[in-house]
Amino acid sequence: MSGAKQCPDCGSSDIVEDAHYSQDQVVCADCGCILSEGLITTTAAEESHLQAVRFADSTGENDSMTVSKLRGIVRVRNICRVLRLPDGFSDTAVSYYEQAYKHPLYHSVSIEKKEIIVGCCVYITCRQHQWPITMATICSLVYAKKELFASIFLSIVQVLKLDVPSVSLQNLVMSHCRSFKLFKDSCEVPSHYAEKLDTVSERTVQTVELAYETWLVTGRHPIPIITAAAYISWQSLLPARRLSCSLSRFCKLSDVDLPPPSAIRLRELQGTLIKLSVYLPWLKVLSLNKKTVVQHLGDLLRHRVFLLRKALAVTEAELSRGTLADTEAQLSRGTLADTEAQLSRGTLADTEAQLSRGTLADTEAQLSRGTLADTEAQLSRGTLADTEAQLSRGTLADTEAQLSRGTLADTEAQLSRGTLADTVAQLSRGTLADTEAQLSRGTKALSSNDQPNSTFVFLPPCVSNPRKRSRSIPFPRGHLDITGDEDISDSEIEQYLRTPAEMKEFEQALNRDDELPNA
């Protein structure tokens, strides 16, 4: 273009030709004013060399989209809008949804699972950006079950190979506390119930951290625990006016839903505070209960590190005492058994020896006295001559020998039986009494140490309160359930066949059964 041409707006002579798509234009380089436009249509000669081209081929991409995919993308953006997420979150969630939509694992799924996939993409985006949100919130938006949502969430994370960080507990507490109406400047809230958000949130975070360190958060949903911690923290800031307010009324005034497990979490938190209050000297003298312990929540949170260490030290001491008592009880059982065996052996031997010595001496003394008395009586009756004759023949010697042999043997046997029986009975009674007394002491020590005092120990919920699993009994009525007419398959019969003769008889029986229908 000639340089003599000037721009009518600015007077500049810098005029250039600009090809705007298929239209040639003359434009001022300084102000951008269009001096003349090219031809909008082509000539007949140019059109003769052209051919029809599809839009997808001309642009290089296919803008056509299935209805289900478009509906899913719209649903993702709507959920992000409901949660008031930043604009960048929705783009990231849409990209995750498109990746999941292309994966063959999620092609033929139900409508419910498609909704859950949408929610999972939004939830993953929030987790990656440290946006405090819970799985229960997303489940309520997509009307999904938590168990199914959790399974699909894990599946998407594995399939797409995404890195999902854990939820920050502090951010989650702060986010949940913002939803309480009592912590906002509202005219509808009574003055003695209103509280500043920062003050309550700070104490709630400390209470939740204490619950985490005492195993109350393990395996639990966070919202019920945060609700209970917020309620206790709110009460402790003005206990005189707020102790009479119940948890349900607190949630109603705060305009939030009351999760069903919140009451259980509240009792667990109160029990933990009572356990820790034992180790503070100025609280140990007080008889605290679940309501009055809330008044001292600030002191317990301020010294919680010391209190937890003290509780663990006392627990270790209790367990060590229990181990020593167990060892002493086992040793006492073994020692008593050995002592009793030795006493029974030694006592019987000593008793027999003493009895044999004492019985012989007593028997000889009695016989000598009785024989002399009889002899004097016989002599007094005039039988002295006969006695002298018998004595001369040696009868008296034989009689004494027989008496000494027979009478001593019988007397010794009877005395040994009776005395030994009495002695063993007395020893057994005394030894058993002592053994039972010692065993009872050891058993009491064991029972007190196998289950340590709940005041000094913090355990996970699954250990402190285990669920009672129902055990099915195979035959509840015993032998009445077995009639002998139960069905049994051929494979089960073959398991019980042992000898070749039994196998042959079984084959013959099968052949007879096959021949009967043909006959």
From Swiss-Prot:
One GO cellular component term: nucleus
InterPro entries according to UniProt: BRF2-like_C (IPR054078), Cyclin-like_sf (IPR036915), TFIIB (IPR000812), TFIIB_cyclin (IPR013150), Znf_TFIIB (IPR013137)
Residue positions, PTM Cysteine sulfenic acid (-SOH): 462
ZnF endpoints (TFIIB-type): 3-36
PTM section of the record: In response to oxidative stress, a Cys-residue is reversibly oxidized to cysteine sulfenic acid. This impairs formation of a ternary complex with TBP and DNA and down-regulates expression of target genes in response to oxidative stress.
UniProt keywords, alphabetically: Activator, Metal-binding, Nucleus, Oxidation, Repeat, Transcription, Transcription regulation, Zinc, Zinc-finger
Region (Disordered): 465-487
PROSITE patterns for the chain: ZF_TFIIB
Transmembrane annotation, as ranges: none
Annotated compartments: Nucleus
GO molecular function list: RNA polymerase III type 3 promoter sequence-specific DNA binding; TBP-class protein binding; zinc ion binding
Primary site of residence: nucleus
A Gene Ontology biological process term: transcription preinitiation complex assembly
Entry binding sites for Zn(2+): 7, 10, 28, 31
Chain positions of Sequence repeats: 173-249
Role played: General activator of RNA polymerase III transcription. Factor exclusively required for RNA polymerase III transcription of genes with promoter elements upstream of the initiation sites. Contributes to the regulation of gene expression; functions as activator in the absence of oxidative stress. Down-regulates expression of target genes in response to oxidative stress. Overexpression protects cells against apoptosis in response to oxidative stress.
Subunit-level organization: Component of TFIIIB complexes. Interacts with TBP and forms a ternary complex with TBp and target DNA sequences.
Family per record: Belongs to the TFIIB family.
Entry protein name: Transcription factor IIIB 50 kDa subunit
Organism listed in the record: Xenopus tropicalis
Gene from which the chain derives: brf2
